[in-house]
Amino acid sequence: MGDMQDHEKVLEIPDRDSEEELEHVIEQIAYRDLDIPVTEMQESEALPTEQTATDYIPTSTSTSHPSSSQVYVELQELMMDQRNQELQWVEAAHWIGLEENLREDGVWGRPHLSYLTFWSLLELQKVFSKGTFLLDLAETSLAGVANKLLDSFIYEDQIRPQDRDELLRALLLKRSHAEDLKDLEGVKPAVLTRSGAPSEPLLPHQPSLETKLYCAQAEGGSEEPSPSGILKIPPNSETTLVLVGRASFLVKPVLGFVRLKEAVPLEDLVLPEPVSFLLVLLGPEAPHIDYTQLGRAAATLMTERVFRVTASLAQSRGELLSSLDSFLDCSLVLPPTEAPSEKALLNLVPVQKELLRKRYLPRPAKPDPNLYEALDGGKEGPGDEDDPLRRTGRIFGGLIRDIRRRYPYYLSDITDALSPQVLAAVIFIYFAALSPAVTFGGLLGEKTRNLMGVSELLISTAVQGILFALLGAQPLLVLGFSGPLLVFEEAFYSFCESNNLEYIVGRAWIGFWLILLVVLVVAFEGSFLVQYISRYTQEIFSFLISLIFIYETFSKLIKIFQDYPLQESYAPVVMKPKPQGPVPNTALLSLVLMVGTFLLAMMLRKFKNSTYFPGKLRRVIGDFGVPISILIMVLVDTFIKNTYTQKLSVPDGLKVSNSSARGWVIHPLGLYNHFPKWMMFASVLPALLVFILIFLESQITTLIVSKPERKMIKGSGFHLDLLLVVGMGGVAALFGMPWLSATTVRSVTHANALTVMGKASGPGAAAQIQEVKEQRISGLLVSVLVGLSILMEPILSRIPLAVLFGIFLYMGITSLSGIQLFDRILLLFKPPKYHPDVPFVKRVKTWRMHLFTGIQIICLAVLWVVKSTPASLALPFVLILTVPLRRLLLPLIFRELELQCLDGDDAKVTFDEAEGLDEYDEVPMPV
């Protein structure tokens, strides 16, 4: 600990993920990205430093400019080859987002965030202020650059003329890289003498604390070294070469900063990438200067994107020095105290983000005159033309725009499917769509006495899915039955039973009204209303459905225990399709099957992102977790032959679930009794409620799938997709089949399965999205396979209902994962010191956060009461009332900043493997 008190460290956090998260927040407060054209860049404030005669002034604008390309920085140090006793430049470290150091055995250490010592930054500032700067140097070789730089050194009295030749030979020495060190006996820092022969340092070399830390970090805390990041460097990377060496005949440290006019490949560099910047740091051996750390400080500076932009555009030394000062202002100093815990260090990250926020804010600029035109409505914003929710003011204008935007890609929607990844996605999504279809089909049959069941749901999913894949604007959406629709079907069936109405005929009239409603909404471009549905309403909706799932699961289990109670003795049992009276072990086995299915599905879900087995195997097992769980528990039930369990009712072939009660075509005037005329017109009310549910799920799902972070290029169509989904549902009701909606989790899973990830831009960096296979074939094939599954009656009929209850419970529990409301409810029972470090905790007072949570809980309770009464049909209408509540009432109670933290969309699109995280955590919507 004593050594730590001799130095202060600077904590640098150039984390790409942190920067991206910060940019997302800063966009809300007029953040301007730094990757902008040169013409829009505001001139930096130059220090009042006069240009010297030797500053290389560019005669034309540099072609080097800030771009979105990745940066690669390489640090080479002058070393002594122990075997051949000759000097050479050795690659000591490189930066590809993160820092990677070369170990003594010639193997790269693990990538890590750069840390810098306080004195190294002070020394860097000192040498920068007296350095030589050559901007837009028109040289294409290392020798040419070295000659120009040494001439400038002499002109500015940085070095003596007699030192020129020695330094020139040194700069052009042989270069070695990681693979070359394996053939050497070792290297060590060397000091260049006047004769050109290396010498040992004049003073005994005692590694300083920062060098020890550097070596320890290079060796890594783990025994497993990192492979070289060379192959992971993206093409067209902006490359910087930093050279650090010791020369005993120099009087003082000298720095040369070179910006090439054209980025060109230089010989002897580890990569054939064009070099844009060259930094040379040379100086005499001194006990207070560690040139390795000085070089690391310079290299880290060149990886920082704000300084890199300035370095690309600077026209004078003053601008670079000003940017360096700004870099130092954003650096945190860790005082020499006792070693803190890791948790304490994490508290520094928000402080660093705040410093970065201020650094990224643009300087005040003159108002753009075009801004006033845009505010007056005279000119559209740059992205308005492509906004699918922008209203045109014409009848069916949005629908026509969707067709014109999306259908020109129709041919590519076919050709883009010629990829093995699409075939793999078809297999995966088939099981992801089949499992809930069978589960909801079985439960729907239970709720409606088999007036609709598995066969109707499978056929409806297949037919509507095929049509949507062929005609939809966003074919990556997966249509299916969902929890909210199941709740409505149960409520409407109860309503019809209590009023002596034919349920299946009433659905047909609802279908008529659905078609009329969707035509009117699409005609007047009503899809724009989805923008007013915030996370507040989505989470109440999702939480309610999750509670219903969980409640229904245990309600069904209790009913099984009531039908087959546990008794001390039983009469002899004759196994029949459905025995009458109590049966031994039926209730207990049903409990085991339900709990076993739930636990297996949860375990396999977590296993997907665990650290066991190779990643591909984990993902396969995790992605097929639900069907695997069903299969295992069906086998368990099959092997237990002497205990009865209620099975899924599936008709043989293309038959309706209850052929004695209905056929495939529903007569709108009534099947067995005359359907009352008043109900034909009154059906518009339940039709409106169904429309609200489908509108909410489908439009919000389209918003989530079409997020800009997913980098889809073909666009989407809210109006066209809504017309298809609701219209097909209305027609399906005439055939006694369920209406469907776009399902959020399944659609996000489909999009993820078709996303092609590029190689990571650097060691430790996250892989970037390369493209998304936007095509129609995967959805088409999945729908066909779901339709063919109706022929699997011998297999489906062996599934116990208790297994489906386990899947129902699984869907209810997992749906809570991405709901911030659930997290805030848990915080009600935690002391504030244990609250997480998230915006809605940090920026909002605890009691006001709990007040917001309480209001949501009250809304949730009201919805639950409505659902539990005969007025349960009105549930969607009561739900939609939370939208004006959020828009009109809550702003009177909470400040805008508080609402942004509590009701902001902070869900991120991520493809990184993180333990316990998947698609459920990304979407605050019901399954």
From Swiss-Prot:
Residue numbers spanned by region Dimerization arm: 317-370
One BP annotation, GO: chloride transmembrane transport
Lipidation (S-palmitoyl cysteine): C859
Pfam family, one: Band_3_cyto
InterPro entries noted in UniProt: Anion_exchange, Anion_exchange_1, Anion_exchange_CS, Band3_cytoplasmic_dom, HCO3_transpt-like_TM_dom, HCO3_transpt_euk, PTrfase/Anion_transptr
Residue spans crossing the bilayer: 421-444, 453-473, 477-493, 503-523, 536-558, 587-607, 619-639, 680-700, 717-735, 736-753, 777-797, 798-816
Residues recorded with modification Phosphoserine: S18, S199, S222
Residues with attached carbohydrate: N658
Residue positions, PTM Phosphotyrosine: Y31, Y56, Y372, Y920
Cellular component terms (Gene Ontology): ankyrin-1 complex; basolateral plasma membrane; cell surface; cortical cytoskeleton; cytoplasmic side of plasma membrane; intercalated disc; membrane; plasma membrane
Reactions performed catalytically: hydrogencarbonate(in) + chloride(out) = hydrogencarbonate(out) + chloride(in)
Gene3D superfamilies: Helical hairpin bin (1.10.287.570), Mannitol-specific EII, Chain A (3.40.930.10)
Keywords tagged on the record: Acetylation, Anion exchange, Cell membrane, Glycoprotein, Ion transport, Lipoprotein, Membrane, Palmitate, Phosphoprotein, Transmembrane, Transmembrane helix, Transport
Biological role: Functions both as a transporter that mediates electroneutral anion exchange across the cell membrane and as a structural protein. Component of the ankyrin-1 complex of the erythrocyte membrane; required for normal flexibility and stability of the erythrocyte membrane and for normal erythrocyte shape via the interactions of its cytoplasmic domain with cytoskeletal proteins, glycolytic enzymes, and hemoglobin. Functions as a transporter that mediates the 1:1 exchange of inorganic anions across the erythrocyte membrane.
Protein name: Band 3 anion transport protein
Organism, scientific name: Rattus norvegicus (Rat)
Gene coding for it: Slc4a1
